[in-house]
């Protein structure tokens, strides 16, 4: 969106471009804000999974998750672990706070390698999409906390495609 800033004489003296879309600039404060906003959204989905896991554990006779879908509990533990570690804690602390507050504390005008920060901000939603696509594979990738490639070729009730997609994400 283009905005003109007018001087007191009515002449346009400056043309500025304001972008409210994906981060297409290398301003470290804006990139840090995108990190913090994305970690907030991923944290909400991780919190929903945490509440679902706790409700399942506290109800002894009544089950929240239907008994026909036994792998969904393991799948929710896998997704909860990935979301909380790799989509909430690491991008929030390293990307969000590291890009927003650390340069301000140090008095640095810019950060080193801002284009790499920009690229990693754009890769996070793609990675989240791959993690969600692993849900739609055959049985899902309900491996719990153990995510490693031999599980993708095992004869267990896991989806080999789902494990590969969640490792790639």
Region roles according to the model:
Residues 1-169:
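...captures the hydrophobic TM-helix bundle architecture rather than a specific catalytic motif
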């Amino acid at each position: 969106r283009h905005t003109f800033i007018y001087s007191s004489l009515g002449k346009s003296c400056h043309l500025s471009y304001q972008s409210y879309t994906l981060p297409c600039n290398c301003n470290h404060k804006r990139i840090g804000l995108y990190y913090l906003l994305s970690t907030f959204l991923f944290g909400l989905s991780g919190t929903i999974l945490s509440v679902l896991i706790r409700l399942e554990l506290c109800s002894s006779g009544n089950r929240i998750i239907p008994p026909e879908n036994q792998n969904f509990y393991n799948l929710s533990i896998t997704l909860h672990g990935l979301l909380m570690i790799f989509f909430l804690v690491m991008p929030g602390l390293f990307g969000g706070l590291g890009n927003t507050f650390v340069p301000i504390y140090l008095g640095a005008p810019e950060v080193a390698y801002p284009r790499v920060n920009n690229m990693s901000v754009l890769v996070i939603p793609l990675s989240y999409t791959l993690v969600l696509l692993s849900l739609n594979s055959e049985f899902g990738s309900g491996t719990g906390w153990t995510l490693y490639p031999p599980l993708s070729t095992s004869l267990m009730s896991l989806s080999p495609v789902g494990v590969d997609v969640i490792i790639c994400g």
